[in-house]
């Protein structure tokens, strides 16, 4: 079966999904080609004892306005959390390290 599309995005990670969203916003018929079992790329969450643990990259700098704008366009603006309003750490090089307050999770 052959399907014609305006835009084929290879990879369902955050960049691929953002590209697909941008194409759809322009009215393109879009298909996302993902080799893995789920979209998200490096963004993954595991649940241990009922607590969600982020397994991959899930933070970005709030000083990048395009990232914040994209989250708002997708209806995720209310889900953004700043480490300044809580405590957020990342495990790196064998130690817990506090995330800078200008990042959003």
Locations of the language-model features?
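Extreme N-terminal starter segment of soluble prokaryotic enzymes
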Residues: 2-7
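N-terminal Rossmann-fold NAD(P) dinucleotide-binding loop
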Residues: 16-17
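Glycine-rich FAD pyrophosphate-binding loop
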Residues: 8-10, 24-49
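Dinucleotide-binding Rossmann-like beta1-alpha1 core, especially the glycine-rich loop
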Residues: 49-105
């Amino acid at each position: 079966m052959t399907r014609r599309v305006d835009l084929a995005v290879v990879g369902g990670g955050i960049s691929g999904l953002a590209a697909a969203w941008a194409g759809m916003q322009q009215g393109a018929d879009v298909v996302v080609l993902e080799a893995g079992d789920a979209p998200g790329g490096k963004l993954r969450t595991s649940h241990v004892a009922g607590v969600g643990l982020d397994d991959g990259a899930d933070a970005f700098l709030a000083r990048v306005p395009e990232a914040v704008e994209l989250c708002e366009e997708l209806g995720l603006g209310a889900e953004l959390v700043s480490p300044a309003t809580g405590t957020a750490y990342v495990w790196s090089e064998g130690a817990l390290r506090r995330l800078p307050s200008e990042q959003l999770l």
